[in-house]
Amino acid sequence: MNKPITYAYIETTNHCNLACSFCNRDEVIGALQHMPLEKYREMLEGLKHHPIKEAKLMGMGEPMLHPHFDEICKIFKEYFPDAFLIVATNCQYPIKPGTRLGDRFQESMKYIDLLYFSIDGYKESYERDRSPAKWGRLMKFLEDFKHMNRYNCRVTCNYVVNPDNVQDIKTIQDEIVDIYNLEELRLNIAQNWSEDESMPGGYTQEDIKYLKDVWSQNIKGKDKWDYQDCFWVNEGIYTTVEGHVKMCCMNTGAEPFGNLFENSIDEIRLTEDYQNVKVGCNTNNPTSHCKNCSYKELAPMLTTIKNG
């Protein structure tokens, strides 16, 4: 018996203006496309009987590049008015007030509950890891954003930590989060999104001590986690712009279990392959699908940082 879906991760575009060093999008995406609004409604129609409480409208693309992203957010709230809606953006596009993209961005905030600004590193390290991002373009974005009506949308900085940008964290707190009145600095240890690869190391003992002593309260993720704790297999859904269903955002390189435009989500979740992955996690005996899960690989490091 499957539990109802309470968490949805929905990709509505796979267009992106960056090639981030930690992203595997080139390995996993198909033809570039934006999901048409009629297909999007069709997808939500097939999910509306599930009690979705939280959702992320993002994936392997930059969400705001969808030409109707404000409508995407509005329509989602029509189907799931009580769901908490999260979106992440790379801030590498113009949002000057009065422009088409600027108006789309501001209109979207009427429906988004939490907006992540993805900013990893400072100047040189930022441009290195988020190539071809430009620091100057980010600053122009933030200056234009500063004067916008946020409505009731909470806005935070989401920072992916790697061994080469640890020392930039304090600068981002001081010069971005504080100056532009962002809610918090969320720190996420870099994760690997491929099924057949493990996470690289590279952190020094000094790095770990610094993160523990200064930033442990900002670091997200569970320090005590095992496969049987995975919520994705029981209550989550990850869908691509084509409608393909995958188990989670931790393994975007996996083969899909089905397609929402061909079969219902309930039928897909009953397939043998889907059930094998689910049972494997629930019994703490994971299949090859989950063998390199970064949740599992991160747990010891998060334990050290959060608990010493």
Go through each PLM region and give its residues.
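A short local structural element in Rossmann-fold oxidoreductases
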Residues: S21-N24, E127
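Radical SAM enzyme [4Fe-4S]-AdoMet core and its adjacent flexible, acidic
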Residues: E11, G30-E38, D70, Y79, ...
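N-terminal pre-triad scaffold of radical SAM enzymes
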Residues: M1-S21, I52-M58, N234-G243
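Kinked, hydrophobic transmembrane alpha-helices enriched for aromatic residues
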Residues: C23-D26, C249
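Short intrinsically disordered terminal tails
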Residues: M1, N307-G308
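Proline-rich low-complexity regions
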Residues: P4-I5, P63, C153, P300
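Conserved SAM/AdoMet-binding glycine-rich loop
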Residues: H15-L18, R25-V28, L37-G121
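Short, cysteine/histidine-rich loop/knuckle motifs that typically chelate Zn2+
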Residues: F22, W232, N292
